[in-house]
């Protein structure tokens, strides 16, 4: 009889992080996947990170997750997006060697302490009914093997009753030539989970040797490339270029003439696709005034002959894809290695989850990744690590849930959005979703999260020591700059003019001036050069934003106060005077854990919040008396 503390179903980005996190904390963990060879597979684009997404990768890394370390072993074109803007919206991104990424992830997972991997298909799970809610008991594989578990994490990606479409052709699959998961979808439905359908897509893969790159815009990465992981010193792989081309009026004419053949225009038109990553058919239809759309030709590896054309996701028939591609500059003689396609799949309403990502209907069942309505490797990884941590912690009946708030991390923003607001289309993170993005930056994810993770045993002692060394260095340099006084005359000697009022200013305060940076200050104070480049950058960013932090602090304190005003799980909202029936039903369904969460539920009025607060205070005072 096989027994585990935690079982994770799915070996994608979410499943890998969930399994590793649970195992790291000490849970006896089993990862079940259709195929060990596809663990860590990059199903769509061969890249990690981007705007907001790159910050999530660093947050996962700060919690000792895998994604940051793995991409650093596969990065072949690294860049910081939005570099010309403020550090709060910088987006680390790395083009990956697809094979190296998969192999590095598999190497991590297959050698992880406390973690076992099983190649099987799970068709069902069972529960016990000896408590107020059904409680996870076991999973049953396709060959009827029963595996007992205390906690179960579903990270099924696009496999939950997935169907692939290419034109009028369709077949059950979660990924090209990989079977979908039908049994689990039926099991979830039997427990009355609210299931919906979403879709996503991928472009055709192209033969590199059939592309004419001359005349196309070359896109080199940063020199030197920046690593994602706080534990990585550098990127050691050769860096190669991507190339930029674009569609044109001829391309759009081919697409318009064949719109009726695209699956997304017919069979799938009622199923929502990612709003911010539309297919080329949807781009042409929605933005009819535009004559071109960018297409990024991204290599799939150092030794790969395959090119990923980012920007032309399609569900048109293969012959239409071929005709369309040949109208694009550089692709006149292109050969398709694999057709683009669209995939539709089941997801559950994420409002049926707590902030821990445990379901409200079944105790011990957690969901993470695309099953919760998100899109993207990074969003999946962020959910996976939270689900894994909480599943492992909850093995102790007196555990404190590990919940990241909106002021803690982009992961916290995402999960709060999902479980509070739900989603009717694939959810993607953006910096605009975060109220406190000045604090939620890519440079300080370790300062924000590593200690929190260490306290619950999700972070290794080695990483914790690395964090403390960094904090010491940052504090030392910050104190030096705050104690160092500079006169306007000293700055003028280095070509920097500020108000000649004779007023003494600290070097730290001067950094808030947009015309002054660490390069200038290091010419005046040589000791700055003794610090690591990352420390210098960290202190400079903190100094630049310091005046804004002061203004934002009141907002954050108000937010924290509301988040810390807990609402008992067993509260009966029907007993609160002044709440409409509609609001009572919403609150009873959502079961918000705090006043802050209740306030963010659509339709819950300020007056309702006041009534809830009055009720909580009244009963608190009653208990005291």
Curated annotation (Swiss-Prot):
Residues where FAD binds: 10-15, 122, 181, 370
Transferase recorded as keyword: no
Region (Disordered): 204-226
Listed Pfam families: GIDA, GIDA_C_1st, SAM_GIDA_C
Source domain of life: Bacteria
Cofactor(s) this protein cannot do without: FAD
Record: residues binding NAD(+): 273-287
Primary localization class, coarse: cytoplasm
Molecular-function GO term, any one: flavin adenine dinucleotide binding
Compartments in which it is found: Cytoplasm
Entry keyword set: Cytoplasm, FAD, Flavoprotein, NAD, tRNA processing
This protein's GO CC annotations: cytoplasm
Single GO biological process annotation from the record: tRNA methylation
Subunit structure: Homodimer. Heterotetramer of two MnmE and two MnmG subunits.
Known role: NAD-binding protein involved in the addition of a carboxymethylaminomethyl (cmnm) group at the wobble position (U34) of certain tRNAs, forming tRNA-cmnm(5)s(2)U34.
Family: Belongs to the MnmG family.
The name this protein goes by in its record: tRNA uridine 5-carboxymethylaminomethyl modification enzyme MnmG
């Amino acid at each position: 009889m096989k027994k585990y503390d935690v079982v994770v179903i799915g070996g994608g980005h979410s499943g890998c992080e969930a399994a590793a996190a649970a195992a790291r904390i000490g849970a006896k963990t089993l990862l079940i996947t259709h195929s060990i060879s596809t663990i860590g597979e990059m199903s769509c684009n061969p890249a990690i990170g981007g705007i907001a997404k790159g910050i999530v990768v660093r947050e996962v890394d700060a919690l000792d997750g895998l994604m940051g370390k793995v991409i650093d072993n596969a990065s072949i074109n690294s860049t910081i997006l939005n570099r010309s803007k403020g550090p709060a919206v910088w987006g680390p991104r790395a083009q990956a060697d697809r094979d190296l990424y998969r192999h590095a992830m598999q190497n991590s997972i297959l050698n992880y302490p406390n973690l076992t991997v099983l190649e099987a298909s799970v068709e069902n799970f069972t529960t016990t009914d000896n408590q107020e809610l059904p409680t996870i008991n076991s999973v049953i594989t396709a060959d009827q093997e029963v595996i007992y578990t205390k906690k179960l994490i579903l990270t099924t990606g696009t496999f939950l009753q997935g169907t692939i479409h290419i034109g009028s052709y369709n077949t059950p699959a979660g990924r090209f030539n990989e079977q979908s998961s039908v049994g689990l979808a039926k099991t979830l439905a039997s427990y009355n989970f609210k299931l919906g359908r979403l879709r996503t897509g991928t472009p055709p893969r192209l033969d590199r040797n059939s592309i004419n790159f001359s005349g196309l815009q070359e896109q080199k990465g940063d020199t030197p490339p920046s690593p994602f992981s706080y534990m990585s010193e550098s990127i050691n792989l050769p860096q190669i270029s991507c190339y930029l081309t674009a569609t044109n009026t001829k391309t759009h004419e081919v697409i318009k003439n064949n719109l009726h053949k695209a699956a997304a225009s017919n069979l799938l038109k009622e199923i929502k696709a990612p709003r911010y990553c539309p297919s080329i058919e949807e781009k042409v239809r929605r933005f009819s005034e535009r004559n071109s759309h960018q297409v990024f030709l991204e290599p799939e590896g150092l030794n790969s002959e395959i090119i990923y054309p980012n920007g032309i996701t399609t569900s048109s028939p293969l012959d239409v894809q071929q005709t369309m591609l040949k109208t694009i500059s550089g692709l006149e003689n292109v050969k398709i290695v694999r057709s683009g396609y669209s995939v539709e799949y089941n997801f559950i309403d994420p409002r049926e989850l707590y902030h821990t990502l445990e379901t409200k209907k079944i105790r011990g069942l957690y969901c993470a990744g695309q099953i919760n309505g998100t899109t993207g490797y990074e969003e999946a990884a962020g959910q996976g690590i939270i689900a894994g941590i909480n599943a492992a912690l909850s093995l102790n009946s007196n555990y404190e849930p590990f919940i990241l708030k909106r002021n803690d991390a982009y992961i916290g923003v995402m999960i709060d959005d999902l479980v509070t607001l739900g989603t009717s289309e694939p959810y993607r993170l953006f910096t605009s979703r975060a109220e406190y993005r000045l604090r939620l930056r890519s440079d300080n994810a370790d300062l924000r999260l590593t200690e929190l993770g260490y306290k619950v045993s999700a972070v290794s002692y080695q990483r914790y020591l690395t964090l403390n060394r960094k904090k010491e260095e940052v504090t030392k340099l910050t104190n030096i700059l705050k104690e160092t006084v500079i006169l306007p005359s000293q700055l003028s000697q280095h070509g920097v003019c500020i108000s000649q009022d004779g007023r003494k200013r600290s070097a730290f305060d001067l950094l808030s001036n947009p015309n002054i940076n660490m390069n200038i200050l290091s010419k005046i104070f040589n000791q700055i050069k003794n610090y690591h480049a990352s420390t210098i950058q960290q202190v400079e960013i903190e100094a630049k934003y310091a005046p804004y932090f002061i203004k934002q602090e009141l907002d954050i304190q108000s937010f924290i106060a509301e988040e810390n005003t807990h609402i008992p799980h067993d509260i009966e909202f029907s007993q609160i005077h002044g709440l409409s029936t509609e609001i009572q039903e919403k609150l009873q369904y959502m079961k918000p854990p705090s006043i802050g969460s209740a306030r963010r539920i659509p339709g819950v009025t300020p007056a309702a919040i006041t009534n809830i607060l009055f009720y909580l205070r009244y009963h608190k005072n009653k208990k005291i008396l």
